[in-house]
């Protein structure tokens, strides 16, 4: 598998590429990070507009970069592809890494050579004198107030760091975990680390507390890493592969990392800003409320406090930020692009899957539509349960709709037609109770625990129905071709207005 592999060394390389293609605009006016930047970015994103570099945000000498991944194409560019459709190749790569197969012969081995070459880029490369450590701040010089951290919505509890790349390592693991966990600012050197209990960072912290009770847990937070590293942290990377390794595959070059000053954690060498510090045992604080990707404010809940004891940064750093709100927002756009990555991964496990679609209106992952080549009675239910169980990204998907391969999974007119003509509610709804649900989903009766429902909107096979199944109406192919030939000459829409 060959890829374009755009080798952006850092965020600034990516900014230059976007600006050259008219995909980024510089904003010279002084705009307030308190609410105003959210409104500007939201209007721009909803119009499929460019990334925005606010050069003079009010109250800060540090520029703010927003709406970076505000279109699927910019996500694709960040992953080294030129189009959203090409992201299927990223999924093919991930599927082969998740379940590698030995070559079936010499010819197959030669065909796999490009993949083997790419694997050489997986191991990160440690460097010294990294750009991210050009300036080092300690003690009283540490002040998060120097950065234009957004307060996104009127009901938010305060400023929120929204694109933090959090690096952790558990006591039993050699590899580090990278994840995006938002952080509420509660002091000049303190934030609240909001991570859910099943996320990698939270699991590392739990294991650390068990193995080393009473000891502070080292954490590093990179702000403004290169696009491959950032996107690697939100992609369904196999458990055997580090996010740094996957970023190297995307980039076509090994990820450069550098050791932290306060710990042995490794951070992206080209990051704009790095926060180093510790989680101290027993120190928690109530987080929220904040406007979230659901379009609602989330509930207040306690999470660990992150105490920052060192900040390193590049000369003239850039602060990367986003906002979340009712779709479409940046997470929804990321979901649309990453949807293409998921398809080959599912198809590797379930070859009968034709397409898989996460509508952005479904808050990125809460509703999925799957089209499949049905082969036996009960087959749709097998695929349904496969979606819920195969990738952890879909453990929170509340609604799964399964349709036949003659239905376009991305066309609601097709999907609704299939649901209303191929479903009997009593037979074709599968309801599961007491399953894991996103704790932000206030519709569930208990926080973190709720129900899921599957819709079997496929043709029914013997054993699923006793009736003769309906035959879809289709025009004869020869008639369609004949009408295609004479269509323009009929002049039916000639001179029509609008």
UniProtKB/Swiss-Prot annotation:
This is 3-octaprenyl-4-hydroxybenzoate carboxy-lyase. It comes from Methylococcus capsulatus (strain ATCC 33009 / NCIMB 11132 / Bath). Pfam families: UbiD, UbiD_C, UbiD_N. It is a peripheral membrane protein. Belongs to the UbiD family. One of its GO terms (biological process) is ubiquinone biosynthetic process. Keywords: Cell membrane, Decarboxylase, Flavoprotein, FMN, Lyase, Manganese, Membrane, Metal-binding, Ubiquinone biosynthesis. Binds 1 prenylated FMN per subunit. Prenylated FMN binds at residues 180-182, 194-196, 199-200.
